[in-house]
Amino acid sequence: MILTVGNTKGGVGKTTLAVNLAVARALQGKEILLIDGDRQGNSQMALSIRAEGGRQPGVACAAAVEGPALRSLVQQMKGKFDDIIIDVGGRDS
């Protein structure tokens, strides 16, 4: 499954939903890649804090990727993970 969590407005919970969905799917035994497409990098930061605390299971994360690089990364990784979850940044806060 490839899932994008997005909204044009910032602060509506996109990152919270993306991170929690990634962790929930990982707890179900799925191999997950969370792509942090927001320049703020909050998804990556949340997963880093979780990993530093020793929380399992771990979730792979790719940092702030957008545009053609995002498309290329998804194409490259879609066969390596059960799910790819993309947290895209808001444009209108």
Model-derived regions, located:
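P-loop NTP-binding core
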Residues: M1-S93
